[in-house]
Amino acid sequence: MAKVEMYATRVCPYCSMAEALLRSKGIEPNKTLVDVNTEERARMRERAGGRHTVPQIFINGDHIGGFDELKALDQAGNLDPLLQTAAEG
């Protein structure tokens, strides 16, 4: 299974929807709360090319984007193959 990382906040509805979508696929994302950790928020922005909105999702270290991008991947049939790949490293 893929390694999925998600930067989120506790009160973000899009974060909750992204987490629910991933869980429906059998994936428990490694979630980092950036509303309580400013160092992690800065790291998220660096990894996400300056994007500051949440969620920011990474699969096997590759930046996917936010919930809209995750949902679009799923609707196009491209999310499941990504999630089936073995985590690298």
Task: Give residue ranges: language-model regions.
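Compositionally biased, disordered extreme N-termini, encompassing classical targeting presequences
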Residues: 1-3, 84-89
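Local sequence-structure signature of Cys/Sec-based thiol-disulfide redox active-site neighborhoods
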Residues: 1-30
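Residues that form or flank phosphate/diphosphate-binding pockets in enzymes
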Residues: 16, 39, 65
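Structural signal for short hydrophobic segments within the conserved structured cores
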Residues: 30-32, 62
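Thioredoxin-like thiol-disulfide oxidoreductase module
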Residues: 34-52, 78-85
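Structural micro-motif
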Residues: 49-58, 68
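Non-catalytic, surface beta->alpha helical segment in thiol-disulfide oxidoreductase systems
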Residues: 59-86
